[in-house]
């Protein structure tokens, strides 16, 4: 897979200490972008194409098993079996440096139908090696406010930003806007890596205010509180994790890896004809989730939910 030389690219931001930097705005202000929606879309496309090509090559050329089972998820599922009350499981992790504070958007109903179809196709092939993310846990991470801390630290950061400010941030992208003003995500594509599968999107370039503009504005509002923000790896990407690998037996043989790539490429070929779009926060407002979020969480567990 090659990328046109004309496409705008922007480097991802690696995880680091708390900072006053607004990486989202830096992308918009870059001379190659200048806030133009088409360039925003190109940045997301370029990142996705490079990542996908690298992963396909990894699976296709692998002399050994390319899949790494998610040990954290395996341990989490084992804890759930011993202690079915998820709240108690998360409470046991509250004092560890594994918790995050993130603003999420939920997929709309039509995208959930698409996701269900994709999950089934991959699960039918791979079997028990793949853990399917439950529907109620599916989400899109819009921006992160604090990364990998005890819950007490996250709550201190939230207090400094201010609950009223966060509420305004959530409302700014929520159902109080008319449909044509809300950012849209288009052109879904199934992405893969050694840990799992995800459905990625790119911002619609037919509107002046894109999904990335929303991310930049929300981050600006958080910084306006005086807080410094530490984030996980951040990239021009909009994706929903659909499943994670908890085994790799299927991928031990060349045929398994070949068949997996064939199914993924067939899914993506079918997706190219899809005209549906995701209007962010059209059906449900944005939400702030705080705690152990690595494997998703139900909307009812949100600390703050966007309203009008």
Residue ranges and their predicted role:
Residues 2-308:
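Histidine-dependent nucleotide/RNA phosphoesterase domain, centered on the 2H-phosphoesterase fold
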């Amino acid at each position: 897979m090659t990328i046109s030389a004309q496409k705008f690219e922007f480097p991802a931001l690696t995880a680091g200490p708390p900072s006053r930097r607004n990486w989202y705005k830096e992308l918009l202000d870059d001379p190659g972008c200048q806030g133009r929606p088409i360039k925003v879309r190109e940045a997301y496309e370029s990142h996705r194409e490079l990542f996908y090509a690298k992963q396909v090559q990894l699976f296709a050329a692998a002399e050994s098993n390319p899949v790494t089972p998610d040990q954290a998820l395996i341990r989490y599922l084992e804890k759930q079996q011993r202690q079915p009350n998820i709240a108690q499981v998360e409470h046991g992790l509250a004092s560890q440096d594994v918790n995050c504070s993130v603003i999420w958007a939920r997929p709309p109903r039509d995208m959930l139908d698409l996701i269900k179809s994709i999950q089934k196709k991959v699960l039918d092939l791979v079997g028990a090696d793949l853990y399917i993310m439950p529907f109620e846990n599916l989400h899109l991470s819009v921006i992160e406010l604090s990364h990998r801390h005890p819950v007490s630290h996250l709550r201190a950061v939230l207090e400094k930003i201010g609950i009223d400010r966060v509420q305004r941030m959530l409302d700014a992208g929520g159902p109080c806007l008319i449909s044509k003003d809300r950012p849209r995500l288009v052109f879904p594509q199934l992405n893969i890596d050694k840990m799992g599968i995800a459905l990625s999107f790119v911002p619609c370039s037919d509107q002046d205010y894109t999904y990335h503009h929303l991310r930049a504005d929300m981050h600006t509002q958080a910084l306006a509180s005086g807080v410094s923000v530490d984030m996980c790896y951040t990239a021009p990407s909009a994706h929903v994790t659909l499943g994670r690998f908890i085994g790799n037996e299927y991928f031990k043989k060349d045929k398994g890896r070949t068949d997996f790539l064939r199914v993924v490429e067939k899914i993506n070929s079918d997706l190219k004809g899809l005209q549906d779009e995701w209007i962010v926060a059209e059906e449900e407002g944005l939400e702030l989730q705080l705690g152990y979020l690595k494997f998703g969480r139900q909307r009812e567990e949100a600390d703050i939910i966007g309203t009008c």
